[in-house]
A protein has these predicted regions:
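Boundary at the C-terminal end of the N-terminal hydrophobic targeting segment
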Residues: 22-26
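Structural alpha/beta surface segment adjacent to cysteine/selenocysteine redox centers
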Residues: 51-113
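Short active-site neighborhood of thiol/selenol oxidoreductases, capturing the structured segment around
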Residues: 32-50, 72-73
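Hydrophobic alpha-helical membrane-insertion segments
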Residues: 1-3
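Sec-dependent signal peptide recognition
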Residues: 5-14
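Short secondary-structure boundary/capping segments
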Residues: 28-30, 62
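Sec-dependent N-terminal signal peptides of Gram-positive bacterial secreted proteins and lipoproteins
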Residues: 14-20
Length: 113
């Protein structure tokens, strides 16, 4: 029984470490001190998410994010393996601006891939 408890504790520590590392890598754009934070959970293969990104996000970015009034967070919610793989590709880049440009391209070309 003690061996099982040690094993469970080790798994829990690793799991918590992973969660903490993932949380610190939120894909965001805008002022970190903005009074408003918009959190969007989306799948890169969802047509409704693409529509939001192509229409509303660009206006939101131009009017509010670029003026440091809003911080925008993109949270991955992959609905299938293709969305997960696309999200992994986005996360490989180091700069958030580049990541958001890649998100633009992925959403624009969503129907073709």
């Amino acid at each position: 029984m003690r061996e099982v408890n040690k094993y469970l504790k080790a798994v829990l520590v690793i799991f918590l470490f992973f969660i903490i590392k993932v949380e610190s890598k939120i894909l965001s754009i805008g002022d970190t001190d903005a009074k408003v934070t918009v959190k969007v959970f989306s799948s890169l293969t969802c047509p409704h998410c693409a529509k939001f990104h192509e229409t509303i996000f660009n206006k939101l970015k131009e009017e509010y994010i670029d003026n440091n009034l809003v911080r925008f967070e993109h949270h991955a919610f992959p609905l299938d393996l293709a969305a997960l793989n696309a999200e992994i590709i986005v996360r490989c880049h180091t700069n958030n601006e580049t990541k958001f440009k890649l998100l633009d391209e992925i959403y624009k070309k969503q129907k073709s891939w």
